[in-house]
């Protein structure tokens, strides 16, 4: 939000529960509401924003369906990013009998906040089943866009989507 405000003159709000992160937002002049993300969007009216962005958090929320529904209620479009559990190195670690640990999944199985890992196919199926139309998809691996077998070679997924009309 700090970058968007300074580079694009965008007015935005963050939802953050951690005290130190809320303080950092205030110190940087970023608008923030201290709340749990699971209930933080409820305080906004429908269609309050052009976009809602959820960056590398979708896999860590308890109620994925509720969050996506709320994102699409309060905005025209939503943008999410998440680590691709289908990335080949993640698959290989599972094949060897271990939960994946990588740049995008940096936690051990016992201390991870990630409770809903998904692949590109899983997320796209979720969108179809929950009335979300995908507008754009970018799959990245080490700052490069992946177009060949993205579910296998992409580390990080970015999706822009809207409510079905």
Segments the model singles out, each with a brief description of its role:
Residues 1-40:
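Class I SAM-dependent methyltransferase SAM/SAH-binding core
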Residues 4, 71-74:
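Short, conserved loop/helix-junction motifs that constitute active-site signature segments
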Residues 11, 48-50:
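Structural signature of beta-strand start/N-cap positions in the alpha/beta core
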Residues 40-46:
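Short conserved loop adjoining the S-adenosyl-L-methionine
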Residues 47-48, 74:
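Alpha-helix C-terminal capping/helix-to-coil transition sites in glycosyltransferase folds
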Residues 50-63:
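A short SAM/SAH-binding and catalytic strip from SAM-dependent methyltransferases
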Residues 65-70, 77-165:
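S-adenosyl-L-methionine-dependent methyltransferase catalytic module, highlighting the catalytic core
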